[in-house]
C-alpha cells in the first residue's frame, strides 16, 4: 500500500526537479556549501512538490481514465480513495511548509508555495481547458532552481531571474515534445495541447524557437560571470545539438519517434547543465 502512495507523488518528477534545485543552491553558494541548509531545502521542497503531484492526480482523475499511459495510476484503479489522497496531499504540504519556514527563510517558502499554487490551481485545472496550459506549467516547473537559489541568497537577483528564465524556456520544447509523442493520449482525453490545436508542424517550429531562446538565456550565466567557459561550451554545444535534432524533425516521417528522442535529449541537456554549474562557478 505504501508503494501506491509513493506513486501518487510522482517520484520521477520530484527527483528530476531536485537536480535543478541543487544547481540553483550551489550557484548561489559560490563554493560555500552549507549541508544543513541544503538538506532542509531539498527535503522541504520535495514534500511540497509531492503534495502538488498528489493533488494533480486527484484533479486529473477523470482525464487519467481516458489515457492509456495513466490508466493504472492508484486513484484510477481505486487502490487509494479520493479523500485519502486529499488528506495525504495536505499532510505533505504542511510538513514541507514547516521545514522551509523553520530551516530556510520566508522568501524560499513563499516562492515554493507560489509554485505549488500555480501547479495545482492553475496548471492542473486549466491544462484541459486552454492551449496555454503548457506555458502555465512552465512557470511552476521553473520554481525549483529558484527555491534552491533563494534558500542561500535570500533575495531575487539577476542569477535567480536567469535560472528561472532558463527553466521556463527549457520546458516549452520539453512539453511540446511530450505532446507530440503522446498525441493520441491527449486526443483521447480531449486535452487541448498545441499539436492538436495548431498542428504538429507549427509545434515543431515553436520547439526550434524555444530551443534557441533557451540556449541564449542559459549562456547569460557565463556572460554575467556566474559560470565559466566550460559551462558556456556545453551550453552552446548541447543547444546546437538539440536544435539540429529539431531541424531534422521538420522532414521526419515518424513524428512520434522523433518527439521521443527530443524529449529524452531535453532531459539530458538540463541534467548536464545543472550538474556542470557547481563545477564551473566563478567566485
From Swiss-Prot:
- Might you report a single GO cellular component term? plasma membrane
GO molecular function terms noted in the UniProt entry: protoheme IX farnesyltransferase activity
Instruction: Return the broad EC class.
Output: transferase
The biological processes this protein is annotated with in GO are: heme O biosynthetic process
Annotated EC: 2.5.1.141
Catalytic reaction annotation: heme b + (2E,6E)-farnesyl diphosphate + H2O = Fe(II)-heme o + diphosphate
The entry's other comment says: Carbon 2 of the heme B porphyrin ring is defined according to the Fischer nomenclature.
Q: What does the similarity note say?
A: Belongs to the UbiA prenyltransferase family. Protoheme IX farnesyltransferase subfamily.
Spell out the protein name for this chain: Protoheme IX farnesyltransferase
Q: Which organism is it from?
A: Protochlamydia amoebophila (strain UWE25)
Cite the source lineage.
Bacteria, Pseudomonadati, Chlamydiota, Chlamydiia, Parachlamydiales
Gene name? ctaB
Amino acid at each position: 500500500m505504501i508503494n501506491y502512495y509513493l506513486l501518487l507523488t510522482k517520484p520521477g518528477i520530484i527527483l528530476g526537479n531536485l537536480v535543478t534545485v541543487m544547481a540553483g543552491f550551489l550557484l548561489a553558494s559560490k563554493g560555500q556549501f552549507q549541508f544543513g541548509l541544503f538538506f532542509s531545502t531539498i527535503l522541504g521542497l520535495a514534500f511540497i512538490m509531492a503534495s502538488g503531484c498528489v493533488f494533480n492526480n486527484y484533479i486529473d482523475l477523470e482525464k487519467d481514465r481516458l489515457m492509456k499511459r495513466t490508466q493504472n495510476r492508484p486513484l484510477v484503479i481505486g487502490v487509494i480513495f479520493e479523500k485519502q489522497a486529499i488528506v495525504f496531499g495536505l499532510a505533505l504540504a504542511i510538513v514541507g511548509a514547516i521545514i522551509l519556514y523553520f530551516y530556510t527563510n520566508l522568501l524560499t517558502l513563499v516562492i515554493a508555495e507560489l509554485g505549488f499554487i500555480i501547479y495545482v490551481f492553475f496548471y492542473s485545472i486549466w491544462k484541459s481547458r486552454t492551449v496555454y496550459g503548457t506555458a502555465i506549467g512552465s512557470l511552476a516547473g521553473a520554481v525549483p532552481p529558484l527555491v534552491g537559489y533563494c534558500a542561500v541568497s535570500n533575495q531575487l537577483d539577476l542569477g535567480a531571474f536567469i535560472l528561472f528564465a532558463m527553466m521556463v524556456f527549457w520546458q516549452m520544447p520539453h512539453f511540446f515534445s511530450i505532446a507530440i509523442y503522446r498525441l493520441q493520449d491527449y486526443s483521447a482525453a480531449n486535452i487541448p495541447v498545441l499539436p492538436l490545436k495548431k498542428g504538429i508542424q507549427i509545434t515543431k517550429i515553436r520547439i526550434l524557437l524555444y530551443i534557441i531562446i533557451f540556449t541564449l538565456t542559459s549562456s547569460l550565466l557565463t556572460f554575467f560571470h556566474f559560470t565559466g567557459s566550460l559551462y558556456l561550451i556545453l551550453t552552446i554545444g548541447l543547444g546546437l545539438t538539440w536544435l539540429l535534432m529539431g531541424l531534422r524533425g521538420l522532414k521526419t516521417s515518424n513524428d512520434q519517434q522523433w518527439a521521443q528522442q527530443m524529449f529524452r535529449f531535453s532531459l539530458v541537456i538540463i541534467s548536464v547543465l545543472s550538474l556542470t554549474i557547481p563545477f564551473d562557478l566563478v567566485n
